Structure formats: C-alpha cells, structure tokens
C-alpha cells in the first residue's frame, strides 16, 4: 500500500530537521575547539545558554554567563613573562582534537559525548591529555547551545612520563 504523499513529506521534513539539528550540534562542538585552538577564549561563553554550566572536574566549575566569562577569561593570554606567553592557569599552548561525537536528540534538547586528545604546555612542560566531554544541548531561538559541558579526564600527564602509571591526573593540581 502506497504511503500518503503528505504523510511522506512530513516524515521526510522531520528527518531533514533531525539531520540539520545533528549537524548544527556538531558545528557547535567544532566551534568550541576552534575557539580553544585559536585562543578565542572570549567567544566561548556565547556558545552556552545564559544559565549554561561547565564542570571540568579539578580544573574548575562555572554556572551562568558571568562565571563562564570569568572562567574563560582566566585562559586569556597574559603579557609575556620571561619571554614566554603564559596564561593564568599555567597553560601557554594548547591544541585539542575530538573524536567519535555521539549525539542523542529529543526535540529541542539533546545530549552527547565526544573523546578528547589534547597537547597542552602546562607550566612549561609538554603534556598528554585524554578525556571525555559529556554535553547537554538546548535549541534556543533556532540555535543550538551548550546547556552543560562536562569533562571527565582519563589522563593528564607530562609527555616524558606517559600514562602507564597509577596517578594519571597531574595537570591542574
């Protein structure tokens, strides 16, 4: 039995909307990493809702626009000290790479996770970082935003030591 054309159109429109939403959420995650990698920390809070929340374990917490601005403001570059361009958390360089972004949608809300590899210089030393981002998303005024972003570290260790040790979280302590 052939499907009603109007019903088929509605079904296809819903599928296109879901694909568009998934792509917009991927773009949101990609923009976050672009801003980190390019040092555009002041732009990051705009990726969150006004009451957005950040939980980066021992690296810090922030809730609401004022706290998000303060948190990412701490990452803004400070004047060079002794020839090195340092930031207030002790990170003078960072490049992040994400993998396996999984998204679950329910209308104008969603959750997702992705895996992180990062190469920061922390307090003058090269580090290796592996972690998982756990996100909550919400669509507001046609745009997807982070409602909550969590970071679950797997390891944060000096490059010279590697991660084959019991204490795998050495950055930010």
Regions found by a protein language model. Name each.
Residues 3-13, 89-173:
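A beta-strand edge to alpha-helix "cap/lid" segment located at domain peripheries
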Residues 28-31, 43, 132-136:
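Short, hydrophobic/aromatic alpha-helical segments in well-folded domains
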Residues 37-40, 140:
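A short, glycine-centered helix-capping/turn motif at helix boundaries
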């Amino acid at each position: 039995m052939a499907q009603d054309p109007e019903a088929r159109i509605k079904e296809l429109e819903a599928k296109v909307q879901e694909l568009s939403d998934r792509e917009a959420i991927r773009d949101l995650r990609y923009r976050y990493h672009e801003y980190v990698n390019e040092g555009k920390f002041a732009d990051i809070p705009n990726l969150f809702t006004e009451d957005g929340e950040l939980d980066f374990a021992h690296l810090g917490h922030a809730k609401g626009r004022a706290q998000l601005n303060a948190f990412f403001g701490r990452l803004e570059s400070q004047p060079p000290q002794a020839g090195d361009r340092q930031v207030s958390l002790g990170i003078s360089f960072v490049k992040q790479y994400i993998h396996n972004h999984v998204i679950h949608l329910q209308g104008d809300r969603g959750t997702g996770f992705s895996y992180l590899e990062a190469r920061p210089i922390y307090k003058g030393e090269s580090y290796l970082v592996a972690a998982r981002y756990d996100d909550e998303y919400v669509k507001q005024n046609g745009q997807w935003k982070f409602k909550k972003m969590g970071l679950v570290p797997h390891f944060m260790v000096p490059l010279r030591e590697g991660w084959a040790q019991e204490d795998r979280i050495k950055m930010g302590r």
